[in-house]
């Protein structure tokens, strides 16, 4: 389970909550322009856009969960169990394995428009990363400074949806999630008028009553509605620090605390990390479950014309500022 959003404020932002019950020693990884991106069924990319994002610590390969390239194009993969359907190899199509999709797109495209133009023949082929790491059932939110789309590979084939709300969670299909927002059109960020009946004098006894009916549970459909409502009504200071802070507050409205979502006996899903990409400045911000301090890694502070991956383990231990 996860939630990803876009946000326009002082700059343009993209990020996600990564919710799971197991950590794979996540780290911020920069893939420089000359690091060879090797693919199973298509030509390798020996020179490409630089990429920054969160990866799993496996076999010195940039196995990205979410990432941004130097042009500001961003992608996040989110769980889509029971719906994702990967295909057999098709010689007439562009065969990319799901774990290759993020580096393949970010390595060569600079905008959502370019992505849409070049994935019409995309075939997400069913090839595992390794015997120990089978494919995860995913769908993807892709965004730039102007627009966002959702990519889903389902039984009926490849689906590409324009995403007018800039939000993605998990099941069911994105088009159904978007339609479901119609059920919440009466929600408001202001105090509602009494439309129950003119014959009954009803009191607005509390602030926030315009949000009555806003889902508060952790299911994917509820998180989609809550994240969309929070994001689309959110205000932030027109500064970098104010915008980034507000971005994490938006994600905080749908974060998961340990103990609330039992997956198996004694194992609970929780928000392992939250991220925020500044598309304009190339900065990757994050915080973790135990460390609420916002940390940052800048793509442009590194030498990007090299051939080796650059990695920074997540700062997961709590950080405190002693006032006295």
Curated annotation (Swiss-Prot):
Alphabetized Gene3D superfamilies for the sequence: Penicillin V Acylase, Chain A
Residues binding taurine: 79
Pathway: Lipid metabolism; bile acid biosynthesis
Residue numbers binding deoxycholate: 2, 16
Catalytic activities: glycocholate + H2O = cholate + glycine; glycodeoxycholate + H2O = deoxycholate + glycine; chenodeoxycholate + glycine = glycochenodeoxycholate + H2O; cholate + taurine = taurocholate + H2O
pH dependence (record): Optimum pH is 4.7-5.5 for the hydrolase activity.
NCBIfam families from the UniProt entry: bile_salt_hydro
UniProt cross-references to PANTHER family, sorted A to Z: CHOLOYLGLYCINE HYDROLASE, HYDROLASE
Family to which this protein belongs: Belongs to the peptidase C59 family.
Function (record text): Possesses dual functions in bile acid metabolism. Acts as a bile salt hydrolase that catalyzes the deconjugation of glycine- and taurine-linked bile salts, which occurs naturally in the intestines of animals, releasing amino acid residues and deconjugated bile salts (bile acids). Can hydrolyze the amide bond in the bile salts glycocholate (GCA), glycodeoxycholate (GDCA), glycochenodeoxycholate (GCDCA), taurocholate (TCA), taurodeoxycholate (TDCA) and taurochenodeoxycholate (TCDCA). Shows a preference for glycine-conjugated bile acids as substrates.
Protein name in UniProt: Bile salt hydrolase/transferase
